[in-house]
Amino acid sequence: MTYIQHYDAPLGRILLAADEVGLTGLWFDGAKYFADGLPAEHTERETPVLSEARRWLDLYFAGQEPGFLPPLHPAGSTFQQAVWALLLQIPYGQTVTYGELARQLAEKQGRPRMSAQAVGGAVGHNKISIIIPCHRVVGTGGSLTGYGGGIDRKVKLLALEQADMTRFFVPKTGTALL
């Protein structure tokens, strides 16, 4: 069974989804892939997993590094799961490029190289935004490329984490505006 709750964050309303194992989704209302993978049958109810996710978000939006993760249970391909596991290793307030993430994954899998575009596709389909920190991935040279919740939110999330914002820019055209 899937359970949902809404969370009113400073950057907009968030839909949380969980099963008995862990958090399965976290989306800003109106996000590009809003409620992607959410079963048609779900119940709005407090659960221990959702309570932990809300506690994590409370700390995060208070400007604190939470220091723990709620139980996570995102559905995805083996490749997506590998990329999302790497996202969880990006420290609070720091960023990596899609290319760096691709190199890390290639090294971990014993491959000579990995497509940054393929990694970007997996990053873009992350169903547990913020907690699995896809907002910490930037384009080469500091380009703030696409974020499902919107570039304005990506900028605000990085600023909340006190990332060095002087290194980043928003391109005038392209996927950054998605």
Residue ranges and their predicted role:
Residues 5-10, 64-178:
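Nucleic acid-binding interface residues in structured DNA/RNA-binding domains
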Residues 18-69:
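Compact structured core domains
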Residues 1-24:
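DNA-contacting interfaces and partner/effector-binding or oligomerization modules
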Residues 15-16, 25, 97, 146:
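A sequence-level detector of short linear motifs
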